[in-house]
């Protein structure tokens, strides 16, 4: 019985991890106040079509790989910006945005409003669908 419960939990985790969901409401993000960085340099610049806001921690084993993956997307696609916020010692940010795992990625529209949220390593086809809705190709 315990083995069955563990199997169901593992399958559920694999299916849901990296999937995103639309965000209801119009919550705007101020990158400057969050302490967002781009290549280690503070920034408050949004992408012309979309911004990928990655929340990471020092201890996140998957965050560097996701950072590289999203930076490559930014390089390939026009109008897209990728920025990062380290929440290792900033529990107030994790609480404000209900972040329980890293990486967590928010897709922001050109006004800085959260339109999509992904917990874990993003599934690229799903992320691309959301970016295309914002005109990123």
Where are these regions (language model features)?
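N-terminal targeting signals for export/organelle localization
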Residues: 1-34
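Anionic-ligand binding region
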Residues: 34-42, 48
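Short active-site neighborhood of thiol/selenol oxidoreductases, capturing the structured segment around
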Residues: 46-58
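The canonical Cys-X-X-Cys-His
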Residues: 60-63, 105
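Typically the conserved alpha-helix immediately C-terminal to a functionally engaged Cys/Sec
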Residues: 64-77
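Thiol-based oxidoreductase modules, predominantly thioredoxin-like and allied folds used
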Residues: 78-92
């Amino acid at each position: 019985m315990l083995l069955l419960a563990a199997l169901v939990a593992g399958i559920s985790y694999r299916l849901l991890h990296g999937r995103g969901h639309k965000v209801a409401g119009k919550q705007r993000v101020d990158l400057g106040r969050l302490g967002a960085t781009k290549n280690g340099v503070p920034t408050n610049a949004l992408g012309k079509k979309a911004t990928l806001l990655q929340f990471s921690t020092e201890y996140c084993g998957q965050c560097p790989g996701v950072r590289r993956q999203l930076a490559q997307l930014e390089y390939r696609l026009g109008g897209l910006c990728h920025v990062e916020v380290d929440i290792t010692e900033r529990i107030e940010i994790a609480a404000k945005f209900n972040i329980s795992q890293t990486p967590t990625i928010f897709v922001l529209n050109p006004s800085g409003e959260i339109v999509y949220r992904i917990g874990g390593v993003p599934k690229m086809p799903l992320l691309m669908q959301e970016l295309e809705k914002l005109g990123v190709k």
